[in-house]
Each structure stands twice: as structure tokens, then as C-alpha cells.
């Protein structure tokens, strides 16, 4: 099955709700993100902190897209899958996946560890040239102990829903400043580039390595961090 896939390009990106900065000085970045996402040329784009809608931001920014951010960012011909992680006073946000390939199924798993952080996993099953591919989009918590428990929930979900012989990608914002989750992920057969570390946060001057792509049943060929305004 894997040989039929040839190569697959996967991107993970925390878009921070399509806005740069906080408070009165914040500015709308979703249109720049559209150019970035379409410029990736990726087969699969895993997104975190994606707004389904937000009434406050819609009133503030004149050019706020009418569509949800996942649909807005999807390149022509791609399918967009979005599921909510957090519901707020003015709207909601969560994880999304944009796929060049047909979507066979999807699911969402709440992995919130405490009431101050709402976190989730988006599990999407794709048909890549007739072969199944599972992709899990993850956004883990800010506290290390929470992340450890959330990784165990990832493992339990994989055991229930992903056959061991079917290729798997788990990608997203792990908030893992070191490589403290690697061993736990490896226990589920998930591997990443062990000896290559690229800083990914903050995007304009990356200093920390928070974003990861793990794989099982696939062989990583190369890794890079795109550079630009975002």
C-alpha cells in the first residue's frame, strides 16, 4: 500500500486564529496565510487554532472572511475538515485538515486535561491513490504533565481506530519545548527525524521547536521550515 503512495508532502501550521498580535495592536493575517498555505504545494495540511467563526473579530476586521477559516484556506480542489476544540463567548476554534486526496472518514476526540485548556485530536482517514492513510491533527496542552497524559490518549485512540498495517501521520503543535515526548510517541511506533531540529516558534523569528510530524508505516524523506512573513 505504501509503495502506491510514492511520496507525500505534509505540512503542520498553527495559524493562531488568523490574527497576529494581541489587543488593539493586533492585525488580520488570514489573507497572508491563504497565500502561504497555497504556496506550500502540500498534499496534506494540518492546521491548529483555526476559527470556525468569531463574531467579535468579524465586526472588528472589515475583510474578515465570510467562510470558516478551514474552508477559506483550502486550495482549489482540496477537501477541508474542521472540528471544534474550544467554544468561547464570541465563537469557536479547533483543528483542521486540508487534503488533496478524498476523505473517507473523520472523528474528533476531546483530550482536555483541565478546564482552563480545551484541546482535541482530529482523526481523518484519506484515500491516497487507493491506499488508506490516517492523519491525526493534534494540539497539546501548555503543561508538561498534561501533554504526557494527552499522548497516552493519542495512543489509546490509535489502538482503537488505526489498524497497525495502515500508514499513519500524527502532526501538530505539541508545545514540547524539548524532545520529552519522543519516547512516549515511539512506544506507539511513531517516529520523527531524531537528529534534525528546526525551530518553528515564533514564526517571524523561530527560537523554539514546538511543532512536530510523526509517522508510522511511512519513511520520512526530508524536513524543512518555510520562511517568510508567517
Name each region found by the language model.
Residues 45-48, 81-84, 169-173, 194:
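Active-site neighborhood of phospho(di)ester-bond hydrolases with catalytic His/Asp-centered motifs
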Residues 8, 43-44, 133, 167-169, ...:
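Short, Asp-centered acidic motifs that coordinate Mg2+ and/or phosphate
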Residues 14-15, 49-50, 138-140, 167, ...:
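Active-site metal-binding loops of divalent metal-dependent hydrolases
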Residues 108, 125, 156-169, 174-230:
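Metal-dependent phosphoester-hydrolase catalytic domains
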Residues 17-20, 52-55, 88-91, 143-146, ...:
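Active-site environment of divalent metal-dependent phosphoester hydrolases
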Residues 2-10, 93-95, 99-105, 117-137:
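Beta-strand-turn-beta hairpins that frame and shape the catalytic cleft
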Residues 1-75, 87-92, 152-153:
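N-terminal, active-site-proximal structural segment of metallo-dependent hydrolase catalytic domains
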Residues 74-77, 90-105, 205-220:
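Conserved beta strand-loop-helix elements of the APE1-like EEP
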